[in-house]
């Protein structure tokens, strides 16, 4: 028994294997970077993602999955520890969760303790991109028995990358390259190759294999054939009413994107959209290689497959928001596909609200391991059996803003999402409040908190205490780097 970040972590062993679970199944844990719900299986009208569509058709597609903080390092640290950002005190791109919770047992550690071989290929914990490619990044050595860090020709081709915002590094700017060469020469192609090699080598023992792809994080680099899938004339910027920004608090807009569309002309923005979609299709192809390998190695029927992104991504919504770091649906919502062999819910979509912190207890239950109490999330194993089953749940997402020329002091934003509502507070309301009714406003165009009806006020009264119970709107006293938020 131990106290972790204010939470009691206690491992209790289940006597039986849960219904629908396998005995010591493998886990193929696939992560992607900065992926919006820009997949055909999620209804994207232009996306070409046949392999992820195949996974969705054979598993459960979660339509309301949410991350805990839409920024790479803290989002990944939260998922892997099963704890919220306020518990691990990670809000920026540099702080390691073990500074706050040195003895926390991560998800792969839990499998390692149960006799699994645990390995990572590519980006599971945080890496700076592209500078960290080929390194260990901000990894957690205790989580893995083996790590593999491929470095492909995309790093050698950096001088060829077009940067639409030359005043910023390609890691942060809208930047892209339609690359020469094959998939296998790119870092993400090499990651797939190495993951397949490990699956072949370890096919006769249980494994937890983390496979982390770097795209579609900027710079958007993929072989040219994927760009060819998306003619510029098929690209469209998202619609927003002309007055959309008038009811949105200043703090709601990310500090790295204060100007709509970075003041870039529409033709350049359409090229950026083309490049983003090209990277999504490129990653889709690499996932297809992994799925094919499971079939070829006879592992598909004894391997749980999880596909997740660290957070969502903006592609010009709300009159020109790009990238992440907001509490709007586009950044807070995360694509999540889960396939447990034999689960009766496979092939269906789940409309219930789940969080990325729910993955830790779900996977340990699905594998028949001990249940770790004191985690922030709750298992959604029952939804894998029946995706439409009732679930009393809500999702919490937060983001920390630095002081800048718009905000006199740092501001914490916290948001709660139910199946119907999104309620957001900035500095506990002192810097703004938002309420969106997804029943009639799925794009979050109308902030009902400014002119609330009696029904809106009742919703706020219900949601506010639920939100504040799980996320503090007070700026943390723990260390954070304002330049790395």
Which residues does each predicted region cover?
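Intrinsic disorder/low-complexity segments in short proteins, especially the signal peptide
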Residues: 13-14, 389, 472
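Formylglycine-dependent sulfatase
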Residues: 20-427, 431-433, 442-465, 479-483
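Functionally engaged cysteine thiol sites
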Residues: 72, 470-473
């Amino acid at each position: 028994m131990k106290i972790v970040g204010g939470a009691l972590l206690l491992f209790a062993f289940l006597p039986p294997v849960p219904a629908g679970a396998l005995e010591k199944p493998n886990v193929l844990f696939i992560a992607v970077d900065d992926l919006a719900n820009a997949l055909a299986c999620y209804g994207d009208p232009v996306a070409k993602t046949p392999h992820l569509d195949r996974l969705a058709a054979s598993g459960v597609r979660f339509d309301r999955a949410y991350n805990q903080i839409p920024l790479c390092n803290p989002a990944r640290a939260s998922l892997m520890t099963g704890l919220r950002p306020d518990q691990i005190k990670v809000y920026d791109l540099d702080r390691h969760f073990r500074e706050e919770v040195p003895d926390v047992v991560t998800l792969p550690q839990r499998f390692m303790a149960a006799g699994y071989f645990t390995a990572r290929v590519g980006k599971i914990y945080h890496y700076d991109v592209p500078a960290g490619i080929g390194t260990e990044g901000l990894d957690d050595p205790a989580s893995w028995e083996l790590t593999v860090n491929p470095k492909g020709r995309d790093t050698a081709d950096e001088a060829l990358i077009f940067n639409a915002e030359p005043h910023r590094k390609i890691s942060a700017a809208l930047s892209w390259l339609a690359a020469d060469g094959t998939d296998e020469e790119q870092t993400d192609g090499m990651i797939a190759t190495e993951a397949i090699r490990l699956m072949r080598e370890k096919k006769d023992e249980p494994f937890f294999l983390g496979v982390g792809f770097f795209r579609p994080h900027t710079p958007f680099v993929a072989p040219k054939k994927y760009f060819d899938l998306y003619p510029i004339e098929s690209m469209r910027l998202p619609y927003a009413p002309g007055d959309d920004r008038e009811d949105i608090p200043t703090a709601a807009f990310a500090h790295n994107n204060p100007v709509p569309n970075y003041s870039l002309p529409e033709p350049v923005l359409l090229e950026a959209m083309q490049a983003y979609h090209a990277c999504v299709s490129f990653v889709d192809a690499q996932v297809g290689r992994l799925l094919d390998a499971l079939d070829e190695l006879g592992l598909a029927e004894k391997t749980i497959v999880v596909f997740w992104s660290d957070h969502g991504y903006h592609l010009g919504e709300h009159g020109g928001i790009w990238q992440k770091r907001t509490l709007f649906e586009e950044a807070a919502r995360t694509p999540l596909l889960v396939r447990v062999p034999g689960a009766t819910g496979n092939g269906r979509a789940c409309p219930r609200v789940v969080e990325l912190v729910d993955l830790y207890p779900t996977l340990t239950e699905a594998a028949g391991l001990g249940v770790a109490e004191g985690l922030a999330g709750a298992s959604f194993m029952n939804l894998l059996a029946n995706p439409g089953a009732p679930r009393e749940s809500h999702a919490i997402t937060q983001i920390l803003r630095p002081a800048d020329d718009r905000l006199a002091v740092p501001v914490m934003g916290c948001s709660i999402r139910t199946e119907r509502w999104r309620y957001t507070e900035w500095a506990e309301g002192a810097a703004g409040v938002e309420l969106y009714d997804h029943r009639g406003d799925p794009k979050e165009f109308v902030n009902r908190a400014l002119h609330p009806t009696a029904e809106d006020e009742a919703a706020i009264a219900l949601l506010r205490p639920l939100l504040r119970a799980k996320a503090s709107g007070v700026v943390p006293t723990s260390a954070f780097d304002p330049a790395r938020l």
